[in-house]
């Protein structure tokens, strides 16, 4: 089993894995699967400042094809020497009860340049930032969630506590940020303002 070791995944490794998955879904299953990508991978695939991630957090959008998508991910793990859980659906605790298609952008179809077997959608930067605000309630390695929130806020152009709260509420209506996350918003806004260009 290759579960025990962690591998740093970069852009090329991830899109190569999507190619393998797409070919498998098309050729072995005769279907087109769809996944929505979140977290570090969604940032890595959209921005040059995120270079690596440990895994690919997804939801499988084609529920009737869930087992085929999981089989394709397992096949890609074996083919490319990736950990068994390189693609996982552990993201549920940080998503709202209902997600709109407007929260996502189309990233691509795989395999690249061939008949498709996999469609990949990415969480938009605004949605990722709201999710990172929610994640501030927990501690993360090297305070990664905080740093990601700073970078995402810079990308979308918000830099005040009020704007951060409004952003969170727009994606998580009816929810309030945990007190530990709320307590970090002034520090977050200050860091965003310090790093803002110009």
Regions found by a protein language model. Name each.
Residues 1-198:
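Compositionally biased terminal segments of proteins
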